[in-house]
Structures are given as structure tokens and as C-alpha cells.
Design a protein with these regions (language model features):
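Serine-hydrolase catalytic core recognition
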Residues: 121, 144-145, 200, 211, ...
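Beta-propeller folds
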Residues: 1-340, 346-349
Length: 636
């Protein structure tokens, strides 16, 4: 019955994964499917499914992070006090695998930018035979250290985080190979000076394989590792003049044949099959198909599963058999829906989750070979609110847009408009979903028309569309919102363009503030949540990917900074930000507030005490949306 206690490292890892729940947030099935591995308050437990017997693992002091089953299911591994450990389940005894890890130089944990920007959440990997662990060593020496304290409890010591700002020192990462039985590690060799980012590691159905990137992220290498010597062989080089997008699902090895690889060199996302030496064998998913996510591959039937489609607001589940044409997998999902899927270990079944603008997420087990679908029962409550949303594409192959009108909409009446924005890389706002539109429908019901659109720089279009924002976050992202808003109003004359407000969070917080600062003739007020204000204060891997290294591209940082536009600002902005945000630090809001205050510009700061980049507290979330509605009623 005691409250859960998490260390700063555990909290940060959950934050990177965008996990707001607490308690048993995940579980892992053993390789034979008979046991569950769960973590709670830094301790590990194994649950026998048949008997429901629970065993607490005999781990030493400190929190156990990133637990995993060994390939044979006889051991459990984890990171504790900066090193990798295993517990032998036969006698419930702990053994240290790596040695010498410290806070500054830990073993087995992914560094901040790997977790936040590369979607790589682990820092160690088992060999298929369970004899060796490949582990990351991260040297934070010389990096900047940011501190976050709880302003409500100044007596509590501040948490400290290594944080790499653009143009400054990054963590130095290397990969070691350690036999579980002991001995000295073997260090993997590659040109880390030219390729400092260890982006992807995989060790399944093929050799230990790495993807490493140069700092500019315009070039990456696929490397095969000899585990006996640590020497590497280059299998493939991927280059892009703007940047190379990472996908953690590739390289995906097909044992004895080669590996699948994702590229955009032909104008849009494409999936290739390459041989063991990296030579191109065939294109399995062509650019015109609209590849979204790779689900998995079943070598027995030579079947690749993926989601995608030509409409970026939706996707469907497809399969390609032995390099043939893609065809739809029969699922319960309607045509205009958003689908995610997981392939079973034996490749025979898929767990398919789908949602639409009228349906909350539902899950079914699908066995394509038998054309069998079995719904998974749900105990989720059905919302009482139904979004009244219209989704369409603007003319001339323009942005996709969505409009939500009030429930009591009166034809002929003019309504103030709220432009809900994100507009940045790797995220779409206009989607065929219900849950994410519930709060926006509530906002519309307060007497607004809510509009959103996905302009240039957003994903699931062409390479040129996404990379149009290179070296400039401000011009096209804001310009597309303004021009798109005007185009939508031509379809919906009830929109009162003399009363437009902008709301967004994170990059959307940046864009909403930018619209009020730079386009005050159109956007009359903004509600800006957790905005990046000066991109020189965000992290290296994200920012340098799009804007370049500051010394080489100072103009990109100047034109993209909100501070540049403060002197000419004419519209009010409300800034809301968690004081414990370890992604977009609270300093961003303080910087903008300081500049606006000294320039005599109207603004309000609403700090969320000791909250991070997410707002998981239901009461705070409720008050947040009430404040959004109140703010726009006051200012529009």
C-alpha cells in the first residue's frame, strides 16, 4: 500500500518513453511464454502464469533499470548502479556483468539524445546464444550539467542531468562486448570521430549490426561486427543532403538472405532488401505505396507486414509476400482509421489495434493464413463526447486539414477560431482518431471553431515536403499555417478571421507563440505550452539535424528563435510550462517572459509546479483546458 518510489533515472527513462502511468507500466513474457517479468519501485518480480506464484529477484541495492530476459529465459538482466547485472533464476543469485560504471561514465544505459531523439531506449543487448552482452559505455566528461529543483521544496536536493546543447559537447559513446562468464571486454571499433552517434544496435537473425551517424546526420553507416575481435565491416552507406531519418526497425535481418533497409533516396519512404554484403537485391515496398511503420517479417512464409497508404491521416495494414505487390490484410479496421500492429514471435498472428474518428481504440488478434479475427475484450469506458470533425486536403496537393465545430453550431453565425498547431517534424495533428480529438471538441463546444493542419516539415508526405524546413523553423511552418487557415475559411465562411488564436504544446508551443509574434495581423493571441524559445538551448541531435551546427549556420538559429520577433510583438501570449521539464527546460519560458517583460509586451506565465514535459495529472489537465478556453474568450 506504500507509494511507489522512483529514482530520477527511472523517472527520466519513463519520460523519454512518454509513459505517464505509474505502477506496473509494462511487462515482458519469457521466451517460452510461461512467465512474466515486471518491475515496481526499482525491484524485479517474476510471475509464473500457471500458478500465479510471484518471486522477487534477489537484486542488490539501487533501482533495477531496463530489465530483460536472456534468450534462453534462464536469466534476467538489468542495469543497477551504472553497470549491467544478471540474476540466475535457478538459484535467484545476482552476478555483475560489467565493471567500473560511474555516474559520469555509466554502462548499459542509452544516453539522453538516444532515448529522446533516436527512439533507442536501451543501452545493452544479448547475443543470440546468451553468452555475451553488448553494452554501451557513455562518457559524459566535460558536458554541461543542468539542474532541476522543486521550487515548492527548496530543501530537497536538485536533480542533475547531462544535457547537450547545439554546438557544444556531446556524450562520447562506445560499445563493449562482455562475456557473461567474465573476462575483459572487447571494444567495437569504428571511426567514432567521423560517426559519433551510435543510433541503432541489433543482434538477431544476423550478425551484431550497428547504425552510426555523423554529427550532421547527413550520412550513416550500417556496420557488421566481428564479436571475437570487435572489428567492423561496412555493409551500406546512406546519405541525404538535408538529413537521414532514423528508423529503429531496420536493419531487419532475414537469416541467410540479407536485411531490410529503409531509404528515401527515391523521393519517399521505400523498403529495400539487401544481401548479407549490403548489395541491393530488390525493392519490397516502393515509394508510391506510402510506407509508414514496419511491423515485422515472417521468414517461414516470406511475408513482410507494414502499415501505410497514400492518405497521411490514416493507415492500413499491408503485407508483401516474397517481394510481390503489397495487399491489404483483412482486419476489423474501417478504411479511414489509424492502425498499429505487433507480429507474434512465430510470425503467424498479429495483434492489431485500430481507431477512427468515431471509434475509440480497439484490439483484435488476426491470423491472416486462416482469415481469422478475434476481438480482444476491453473494459475501457466509452466517452460521452463524439468529435464532430471534418478532415480534408487543401487544393493543389496542399496540407491536410481538420475542422471541429461546436455541438450547437448555428448556420450563418460567425465564430472565433482556435488554430491548434504542432507543425514540426515527426508528428501529425490531422489524424483519423477519436481520443485525441475529444478535448478539442470540448473546446469547440465552448463557442469556437477549432482548426488544425499539417504543413511542410511534417511526415508521411514526400522527402521534399518534409525537408523543406531545413535551416529554417520559422518561415514555412508559420506561413503554411497562415495560408492554410485562409484556405479553410474559404470553405467555412462561419470562421471569423478577425478573431483567431493559436494553441500548441512543445514544438506546437513554439509555433503558436511564433504565429502571435510574427503574424500578429492574423493570429490575435496565443496559448503556448512548453515552447522551445531559443533553439541554442535545445538538444544537439534534434536541433542540428534540422538547423545545422550553430557555428556553420548562425542565421538558421537567429531566424528560428522566438526572441528575434519580440521587439515587434503586438499580441498577448499565455505561457504554460512544467518547472521540472527535462526535455524543453523551463528556462525557455523564462527567457521569453524576460524578453517580453523588458520590451513591455503583454504576456502571462503559468508555471506547472514540479511537472515535466507531459501533463499526466487529470486535475491539472482539466484545469489546463479550462484555462485555454478562458484565455481565448478573454483575448478573442
Amino acid at each position: 500500500g506504500a507509494a511507489e518510489r522512483l529514482t530520477a533515472a527511472e523517472k527520466a527513462r519513463l519520460e523519454r518513453q512518454r509513459v505517464s502511468a505509474r505502477g506496473f507500466t509494462s511487462y515482458q513474457l519469457s521466451p517460452d511464454g510461461k512467465r512474466l517479468l515486471v518491475a515496481l519501485s526499482g525491484k524485479l518480480y517474476v510471475v509464473e502464469r500457471a500458478s500465479e506464484q510471484v518471486t522477487q529477484l534477489a537484486t542488490g541495492p539501487g533501482a533495477c533499470i531496463d530489465p530483460k530476459w536472456s534468450p534462453d529465459g534462464a536469466r534476467v538482466s538489468y542495469v543497477r548502479e551504472h553497470d549491467v547485472f544478471v540474476v540466475d533464476l535457478a538459484n535467484n543469485s545476482e552476478r555483475r556483468v560489467t565493471r567500473g560504471g560511474t555516474e559520469v561514465r555509466p554502462h548499459g544505459l542509452a544516453e539522453f539524445v538516444a532515448q529522446e531523439e533516436m527512439s533507442r531506449f536501451t543501452g545493452y543487448w544479448w547475443s543470440p546464444d546468451g553468452q555475451v552482452v553488448a553494452f554501451q559505455e557513455t562518457d559524459h566528461s566535460g558536458m554541461e550539467v543542468f539542474s532541476i529543483n522543486d521550487p515548492m521544496h527548496p530543501e530537497v536536493q536538485a536533480d542533475r542531468f547531462f544535457y547537450p546543447r547545439p554546438g557544444r559537447k556531446n556524450a562520447v559513446v562506445r560499445l563493449g562486448l562482455q562475456r557473461v562468464s567474465g573476462g575483459a571486454p572487447t571494444w567495437v571499433q569504428w571511426d567514432a570521430a567521423a560517426y559519433p552517434y551510435l543510433a541503432t544496435v541489433t543482434w538477431k537473425d544476423g550478425p551484431l549490426t550497428l547504425v552510426v551517424q555523423n554529427r550532421e546526420q547527413t550520412k550513416e553507416l550500417v556496420l557488421a561486427v566481428d564479436p571475437k575481435t570487435g572489428k567492423t565491416t561496412a555493409l551500406h552507406v546512406e546519405e541525404d543532403a538535408a538529413w537521414v531519418n532514423l528508423d529503429q526497425s531496420v536493419p531487419l535481418w532475414w537469416k541467410g538472405v540479407g536485411f531490410f533497409w529503409r531509404t528515401e533516396r527515391n523521393g519517399a519512404a521505400e523498403l529495400e532488401l539487401r544481401g548479407p554484403d549490403g548489395k541491393l537485391l530488390a525493392s519490397w515496398v516502393k515509394p508510391e505505396v506510402g510506407l509508414d511503420k514496419i511491423v515485422g517479417f515472417d521468414p517461414a512464409s516470406k511475408t513482410l507486414y507494414f502499415t501505410g497508404g497514400s492518405n497521411p491521416t490514416a493507415n492500413r495494414l499491408f503485407r508483401v509476400v516474397d517481394g510481390g505487390a503489397p495487399d491489404l490484410v483483412e482486419t476489423p479496421a474501417p478504411e479511414l482509421s489509424l492502425t498499429t500492429a505487433t507480429l507474434s514471435g512465430d510470425g503467424k498472428a498479429l495483434a492489431v489495434t485500430y481507431t477512427s474518428t468515431s471509434d475509440m481504440p480497439a484490439t483484435a488478434v488476426v491470423i491472416p493464413s486462416l482469415r481469422l479475427t478475434r476481438p480482444v475484450p476491453s473494459v475501457a469506458l466509452e466517452p460521452t463526447l463524439q468529435p464532430e470533425i471534418s478532415i480534408f486536403q487543401l487544393e493543389n496537393d496542399g496540407p491536410w486539414a481538420a475542422v471541429l465545430r461546436p455541438r450547437d453550431f448555428t448556420k450563418g453565425k460567425k465564430y472565433p477560431v482556435i488554430l491548434n498547431v504542432y507543425g514540426g517534424p515527426h508528428h501529425l495533428e490531422v489524424l483519423q482518431v477519436r481520443r485525441e480529438n475529444l478535448a478539442l471538441q470540448w473546446l469547440a463546444n465552448q463557442g469556437f471553431i477549432v482548426v488544425k493542419l499539417d504543413g511542410r516539415g511534417t511526415p508521411r508526405r514526400t522527402r521534399a515536403w518534409e525537408r523543406a524546413i531545413k535551416h529554417d523553423f520559422a518561415t514555412l511552418t508559420a506561413g503554411d499555417q497562415v495560408e492554410g487557415l485562409k484556405a479553410i475559411a474559404r470553405r467555412y465562411p462561419e470562421m471569423d478571421l478577425s478573431r483567431v488564436g493559436a494553441y500548441g504544446w512543445s514544438f506546437g508551443g513554439y509555433l503558436s507563440a511564433l504565429l502571435a509574434l510574427k503574424h500578429g495581423d492574423v493570429v490575435k493571441s496565443a496559448f503556448s505550452g512548453a515552447p522551445v524559445v531559443d533553439w541554442l538551448d535545445y538538444d544537439t541531435h534534434y536541433t542540428e539535424r534540422y538547423l545545422g551546427v550553430p557555428d556553420a549556420h548562425p542565421k538558421a538559429y537567429e531566424v528560428s528563435s522566438l526572441l528575434t520577433y519580440v521587439p515587434d510583438a503586438k499580441r498577448p501570449i499565455l505561457l504554460m510550462h512544467g518547472t521540472a521539464d527535462d526535455n524543453v527546460y523551463f528556462l525557455h519560458t523564462l527567457k521569453l517572459s524576460d524578453a517580453m517583460f523588458k520590451a513591455g509586451k503583454r504576456h502571462v506565465v503559468l508555471p506547472l509546479t514540479n511537472l515535466t514535459h507531459m501533463v499526466p495529472d487529470p486535475l491539472v489537465m482539466e484545469r489546463q483546458w479550462e484555462r485555454i478556453a478562458t484565455w481565448f474568450k478573454e483575448t478573442l
